[in-house]
Amino acid sequence: MERWSYISLLFVALLFGSTQQLRSAEGALRLRLNCKAAIECGAISKGDTIAIKGFTWGELSTAPLSYGIVKGRSIILTLQNAKCGEYVVELRRRAGGKVRNIMEFFVSDAESHREEKYAISYKNDAFYAQALEGAAENGLLAELNASIRDFSAGTIGNKQAKEALDSIYSKALASDSSALFTSLCRLSLDNRCRSVRYIRSVLPLEDPRVLYTNFVKSSVESYLKSLERNSTEALTFIAEDLVQSAHSTLKPYIALQIFNLFKEAEIMGQEAVAVEIAKRYLLNDESGSIEEMLGYETYFSIMAFVQMNEHSLIGMQAPQIELPDSLGCLHSIPQCGEGSDGASPFLQLFYFYTSNCSSCRATTPLLAELLQRYSGIPIKIYAIFTGSSRSEWMSECAKFSLIKNPQVERIDLWDPEVESNFPLLYGVISTPQMLLTTDKGIIVGRRLTPKSLEQLLEAINEN
């Protein structure tokens, strides 16, 4: 049951997105919908609006490509200059309420695709489209959606659903191996679709038509997430392979998708993938075409993310900065050398915090409690206050004075004028921020919480 439940969710929840188009056709595509059955049961009414929308790498357009008002049993929508891609047909009720998805269709060959005819019905709280005329792939897509909706409603069982989907897949392969619907089937209905190697082999990234679809972007994201337990180096290689193998029109979209996926990665250190991909494929564009595609605001945010993170990634030498303590004495951190006895190693913890931050107020006592009971390799903690009020700093310093642990050396520092440039060098755009280095200043942990810090310290001390 698990496999078919997954497939039903995948197809029923087809996402909508904005559209630009790839190839022009000499003429228009007409979509003729016979809505008699849906009107008779009240699912569609006169005065309702039916619209066609398309995709640009999984994003739905805000404006319809074509729309019409229901006046009788049938409605004809004309898609001028129909292009290759994936489309959805939406219903907006005159009385208001949620916009509903009536059906989907593909245009795989824009030059020969001229007309689609469907009968629209409504049951099981879902619309059903029966293909009457048009491309063979859309007849199969209508069958697929009907089977999935029947399965979701419980009107057919797991065995019947499997037989239906397998039959549709076989007919798709026999009908037109180059159709967009066939690519969708390869990615979702093949018995090998849980194999990472198989999915990579059938991702149609060399096909420029898939830029204007939703299903390929979803497959790329699922593919990358299935590999997230790999090392950062391996993930960077995998990400670059995706971008490099793609058609030139797809490259910036795939690179942006990878950047967005890894910039806030749950697994520590994987933000390095976002930095590397952005530097190579989004910011290294002398023509300015990528900046124009992304828009200035998005382009600037990517550039800022890279600049704020590229100096303090895991495995790097932590940037050297000088900060004063409460007596005005400058401390150069991180210290790069061995322990105080000339042989023993130590760890160095950077903790950037302030007083008017609710997260800091929650984190500081947890960190102090952790360091109080810590036993292991000696730690130097640099408690770096990012505020500008000396009195508030002194008050915050008192919270760390409770740490009475011979394994922990605390140094309170601040930089009210930001002369050290620590926000840029250490990516401190918000507080609290924690970063751990070795006694040589090599970064071994970043974006830490008290819990993840404790887990990292346990792992280091076990080794």
Predicted region positions:
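Short active-site neighborhood of thiol/selenol oxidoreductases, capturing the structured segment around
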Residues: 333-367
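N-terminal, charged low-complexity regulatory/assembly segments
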Residues: 162-245, 261
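N-proximal helix/coil linker or "cap" segments that precede and/or mark the start of modular domains
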Residues: 270-326, 335-345, 372, 391, ...
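Non-catalytic, surface beta->alpha helical segment in thiol-disulfide oxidoreductase systems
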Residues: 430-431, 440-463
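Short, internal strand/loop/helix patches
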Residues: 397-435, 439
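Bacterial Sec-dependent N-terminal signal peptides
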Residues: 1-33
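A non-transmembrane, solvent-exposed segment enriched in polar/low-complexity residues
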Residues: 25-202
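Structural microenvironment flanking redox-active thiols in thiol-disulfide oxidoreductases
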Residues: 361-402, 418-422
